[in-house]
A protein has these predicted regions:
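Positively charged, low-complexity intrinsically disordered leader regions
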Residues: 2-43
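Acidic-glycine-rich active-site phosphate/pyrophosphate-binding loop
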Residues: 33-44, 158-162, 206, 258, ...
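Short, glycine-rich nucleotide/cofactor-binding loops
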Residues: 36-42, 215-221, 298-304
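Short, hydrophobic/aliphatic alpha-helical segments
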Residues: 37-53, 87, 207-212, 363-379
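N-terminal active-site beta-alpha-beta segment that forms phosphate/nucleotide-binding
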Residues: 51-123, 154-272
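Basic polycationic patches enriched in arginine
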Residues: 139, 145-147, 206
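Conserved phosphate- and dinucleotide-binding cores of soluble alpha/beta proteins
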Residues: 237-241, 246-413
Length: 413
């Protein structure tokens, strides 16, 4: 993995590909250092996801897809005939799937790349013609279509590696367009919410007040974000709005990432302590809560960053809409409910230590440092996610439509 200082590069997009190489921000170094990492192989991709240099369900999915394509390319380069071995794709996927078990996008993206390769293997064995269509129904390029009817192991390996990489690139592009579409849906939801507020006596001159948790912004996706996509688009149209940003302990992704990217975009915002949201709602200072998610279960339960459930409870108590912005790929109809999700338990060090800049007046080189914030030996419990019951969710804002979480099975029937 290569590190590159890129202090002048725009923050968006979060991931880009140049000459076959994958680049993204090292999010563990933000907001104090803006550094790019180059993911050169499948191990780099797995390490970046596990270490949270790459985080956010959609971005994890994109990097996992690219990592799976790299793993396929690497395996075929080493042993061109390995595709004949039973379960070879499952073996290659294991390292990536083990990195972040809660995010359904990861497994979905890996499965998409694997399926594109399996489609070729099923349609083009040693004794059959190569396929003339890929999974999306598009005709494959001439160089692939004109291969011999009985391809060699080397030519088949090249074909499979090319197909895996192309499918991964398609998924990257799809994430970008998907989030833009979520933004359009979110605009309609938020503006309707604002009109309702104004109809009930709120002044039209007051900015639309949105509270968000963790980081479901552009940094959590290839571009735009999920929860922030509509915020970016409304801001670009000159709509007055203000965002309350939860700090989101213990990794402080709201304070260090969401606030950072909103500042970069010039969007008015205020960072608040995680426990301040309820008071703001009580005082009428929140018009809507907007979050992303790592998974939506078949019964409409939402799995998201720890602390989301408490925001949903407070919003329900004060009659404030609680929206979840997510791509359809985050909806897992194979998972019955939130109670069936494996919740990732993270290191106790995330609770006992905190990263920041020293503020000593004589400090000349202000480099980020880690400090202990509790007595050594304290027992810590650090679940990365919690479960928000479907009944607390006003709606799921996907790229296709606004969905009632209690009617999710009907929507996907």
């Amino acid at each position: 993995m290569t590190f590159i200082s890129m202090t002048t590069k725009p923050l968006r997009p979060t991931l880009w590909i140049e000459q076959g190489q994958v680049f993204t921000w090292d999010q563990t170094r933000l907001p104090f250092e803006r550094e790019v990492i180059c993911l050169a192989n499948s191990q780099d991709c797995a390490r970046a996801i596990a270490s949270m240099q790459v985080r956010g369900a959609p971005l994890i999915g994109a990097v996992a897809a690219l990592g799976m394509a790299m793993a396929i390319r690497e395996a075929l380069a080493k042993h061109p005939g390995c595709y004949r071995e039973a379960g070879w794709l499952d073996t290659l996927a294991k390292a990536l799937l083990a990195t972040r078990p809660t995010a359904v996008n990861l497994a979905w993206a890996v499965a998409q790349v694997s399926a594109s390769v399996n489609a070729i293997l099923q349609a083009s064995t040693i004794d059959q013609e190569p396929p003339t269509q890929d999974l999306k129904g598009d005709r494959v390029n001439d160089s692939l279509r004109n291969r011999e009817s009985k391809p060699t192991a080397d030519s088949m390996a090249t074909l499979l590696a090319e197909q895996a990489w192309q499918r991964a690139l398609d998924l990257v592009d799809e994430d970008r367009s998907c989030n833009a579409a979520i933004g359009m849906q979110t605009q309609n939801v938020l503006m309707n919410n604002a009109l309702m507020k104004h109809a009930h006596g709120h002044t039209a001159s007051r900015p639309l007040q949105i509270l968000t948790h963790c980081n479901a912004g552009a940094l959590a996706t290839v571009d735009w974000g999920t929860a922030t996509a509509g915020i970016y688009q409304l801001h670009a149209q000159g709509i007055a709005l203000h965002v309350w940003v939860d700090e989101t302990r213990p990794r402080n992704q709201g304070a260090s990432l969401t606030a950072y990217e909103l500042a970069d975009a010039g969007i008015p915002h205020t960072v608040i302590a995680d426990n301040a949201g309820g008071l703001l709602m009580m005082r009428g200072l929140v018009d809507a809560v907007m979050v992303g998610c790592d998974r939506v279960c078949a019964n409409g339960d939402v799995v998201n960053k720890i602390g989301t459930y408490l925001k949903a409870l407070a919003a329900k108590a004060h009659g404030i809409p609680f929206w979840v912005a997510c791509p359809a790929s985050s909806i897992d109809m194979n998972c019955p409910s939130g109670m069936d999700v494996s919740i990732e338990e993270r290191s106790a060090l995330e609770l006992s230590q905190i990263r920041g800049l020293p503020v000593h007046p004589q400090q000349t080189l202000r480099q980020p440092i880690l400090v202990e914030i509790m007595q050594e030996g304290q027992i810590c419990y650090n679940p990365g996610f919690d479960i928000t019951p479907a009944a607390l969710v006003s709606g799921l804002i996907t790229e296709h439509a606004l969905i009632n979480p209690l009617k999710l099975r009907e929507a996907f029937a």
